[in-house]
């Protein structure tokens, strides 16, 4: 109901935009082939999909209205999408769907930005709150977000979200709802320091739906994050991130638990080359299901490998040591940019020191004007957790 009230407000605001209105069309398309082969399934999954987004933004002075729809079509549907398809194939979470992706009213000035309605939200590195853009039905929030910059170098970001529109689309049901209501509060305060941006945060996640793990994904996380970069030579830059958080149960969650999160990450950029390494820990409490550190609203694909084996943190938690490198080129043979990347992960449990498995991730990306082509591969080799998995993507994105 609150979403439609917000939408009605957007329509009612129309006369205020009658003169000197800037129109910005929004149009993008994605074509993708995704192949997924897991050792614990009889057959592999193959999904050839086409995702289109289309919309319009109207802007006058500090005010803007934006509306955008997204649709996903399965051209080849030899896969289980989480809702439909052969259950003897592994899940590729891209069900066919047509839905409103964004419908928002925004006021923007130098010290204050307020956005109301269905919107895309990505906070910091999106570990806790993100848009899950890798999936064709990306996540959005019915929310009011306020961003305040009272003085230079200080920013307060506050969001109240009453509904999360999930990747499962309009036909979502059961544990994979199309939307999950609740009283979600996201707050962070960032300050510029000589070492980088220091952010304190509080994320209150309310998955207030009994069919979604019996409320056990509702949690509250409080923590701090430092992200910065500095030149260490004329053509060399060091980038780094440090983060800590503590999580516990929240609202209707019937399980009492407490778990910690740690991240240390560093990358060195030298003349187009990058090497990086990091250590991320999602801690565990007593070893029971969903008493480990969970981030159900984050862009989890960005973390702990692309094979998607650890999107829900195991009961004994996870420790991820990773290292990688890559190289990027500009204006190479008519291509605007070309990049290559490789990352290796070693996964251990936080409790009991179990070796879950190892994973390799490989990515090649080329961009020419408005079109980007990417080839991605993930290989997970299981030891004490899940099953051997190979995943391959061939993807083309076009943005107007």
Predicted regions and their residues:
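C-terminal beta-signal and terminal closure region of outer-membrane beta-barrel proteins
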Residues: 384-399
């Amino acid at each position: 109901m609150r979403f439609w009230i917000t939408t009605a407000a957007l329509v009612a605001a129309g006369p205020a935009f009658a003169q000197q209105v800037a129109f910005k069309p929004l149009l993008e398309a994605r074509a993708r082939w995704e192949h997924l082969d897991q050792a614990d399934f009889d057959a592999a999954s193959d999904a050839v999909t086409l995702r289109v987004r289309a919309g319009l933004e109207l802007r006058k002075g500090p005010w803007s209205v934006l509306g955008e729809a997204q649709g996903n079509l399965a051209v080849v549907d030899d896969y289980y999408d989480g809702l439909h398809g052969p259950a003897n194939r592994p899940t590729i979470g891209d069900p066919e769907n047509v839905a409103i992706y964004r419908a928002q009213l925004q006021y923007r000035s130098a010290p204050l930005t307020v956005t109301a309605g269905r919107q895309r939200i990505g906070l910091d590195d999106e570990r806790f709150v993100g848009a899950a853009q890798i999936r064709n039905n990306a996540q959005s929030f019915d929310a009011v977000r306020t961003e305040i910059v009272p003085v230079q170098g200080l920013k307060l970001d506050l969001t109240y979200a009453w509904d999360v529109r999930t990747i499962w689309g309009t036909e979502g049901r059961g544990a994979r709802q199309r939307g999950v209501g609740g009283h979600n509060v996201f707050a962070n305060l960032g300050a510029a320091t000589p070492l980088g941006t220091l952010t304190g945060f509080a994320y209150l996640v309310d998955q207030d739906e009994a069919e979604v793990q019996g409320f056990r994904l509702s949690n509250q996380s409080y923590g701090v994050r430092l992200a910065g970069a500095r030149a260490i030579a004329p053509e060399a830059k060091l980038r780094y991130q440090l983060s800590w958080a503590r999580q516990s149960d929240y609202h209707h969650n019937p399980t009492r638990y407490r778990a910690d999160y740690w991240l240390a990450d560093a990358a060195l950029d030298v003349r187009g080359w990058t090497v990086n390494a990091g250590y991320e820990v999602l801690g565990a409490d007593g070893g029971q299901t969903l008493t480990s550190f969970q981030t159900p609203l984050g862009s989890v694909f960005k973390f702990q490998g692309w094979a998607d084996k650890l999107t829900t943190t195991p009961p004994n938690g996870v420790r991820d040591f990773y290292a990688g490198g890559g190289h990027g080129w500009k204006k190479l043979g008519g291509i605007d940019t070309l990049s290559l990347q490789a990352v290796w992960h070693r996964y251990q449990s936080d409790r009991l020191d179990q070796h879950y498995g190892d994973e390799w991730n490989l990515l090649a990306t080329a961009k020419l004007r408005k079109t980007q082509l990417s080839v991605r591969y993930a290989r997970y080799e299981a030891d004490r957790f899940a099953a051997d998995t190979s995943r391959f993507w061939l993807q083309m994105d076009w943005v107007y």
